[in-house]
């Protein structure tokens, strides 16, 4: 039991940003549960990466949208962060991990909202979606999940990628909304970091190799 607790502590200490972020998300989830629906809507719209706020205060909303989860259940994020974000942080290091995740978050946000903007301009979507609620950590998460493919040896890597693309490809076809476009885009943004992942794998491998 003591050994298990010690291993958990070492794992958490090896991914401090992941678990600090989870702690913040736990706090904001408590806030979501404690306020009424009207005030919650005001909170979330204020921190949303929608077309209006990206045009008026992009840096603030791109950061603040990462502090909320899209839903009221925190436990699934604990599982997903532990399965994907924490191992990626331990492998890539904090700076590279942030680079991948934030690039996916920002890139997928602008791609999805750009698609929505065009849909509104061509009257394929309602004008009120300019102020839609768009918060959450999923683009960051999907981008990091994608780059983790480079941590997996072939041929298993291709199976991992096939499952990932199949899941979000099906959601793209079934949902046909801007968030599905964002998730699908985040996969390929994450995969663009192959050169960085390759260098990191080589560095980790050289440290693990015993001296002759």
Indicate residue ranges for each PLM-predicted region.
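N-terminal signal-anchor transmembrane alpha helix
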Residues: 2-45
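Aromatic-anchored segments of alpha-helical transmembrane domains
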Residues: 26-31, 105-114, 163-178
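N-terminal TM1-TM2 helical hairpin plus the immediately adjacent luminal interfacial "cap"
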Residues: 33-84
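Membrane-interface helix/loop boundary segments of multi-pass membrane proteins
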Residues: 83-101
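Central hydrophobic cores of alpha-helical transmembrane segments
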Residues: 100-107, 157-170, 186, 190
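Membrane-interface micro-motifs in multi-pass membrane enzymes
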Residues: 127-147, 182
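Loop-to-transmembrane alpha-helix initiation sites
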Residues: 175-190
């Amino acid at each position: 039991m003591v050994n298990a607790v010690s291993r958990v502590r070492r794992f958490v200490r090896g991914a401090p940003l992941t678990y600090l972020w989870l702690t913040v998300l736990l706090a904001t989830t408590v806030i979501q549960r404690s306020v009424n629906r009207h005030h919650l809507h005001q909170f979330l719209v204020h921190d949303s990466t929608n077309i209006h706020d990206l045009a008026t205060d992009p840096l603030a909303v791109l950061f603040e949208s990462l502090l909320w989860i899209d839903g009221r259940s925190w436990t699934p994020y604990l599982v997903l962060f532990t399965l994907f974000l924490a191992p990626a942080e331990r492998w890539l290091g904090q700076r590279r991990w942030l680079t991948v995740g934030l690039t996916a978050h920002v890139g997928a946000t602008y791609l999805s909202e750009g698609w929505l903007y065009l849909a509104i301009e061509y009257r394929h979507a309602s004008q009120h979606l300019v102020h839609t609620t768009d918060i959450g950590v999923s683009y960051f998460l999907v981008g990091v999940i994608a780059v983790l493919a480079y941590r997996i040896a072939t041929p298993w890597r291709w199976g991992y990628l096939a499952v990932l693309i199949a899941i979000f490809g099906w959601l793209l076809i079934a949902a046909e909304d801007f968030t599905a476009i964002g998730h699908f885009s985040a996969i390929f943004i994450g995969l663009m970091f192959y050169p960085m992942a390759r260098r990191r794998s080589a560095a980790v491998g050289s440290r693990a190799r015993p001296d002759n």
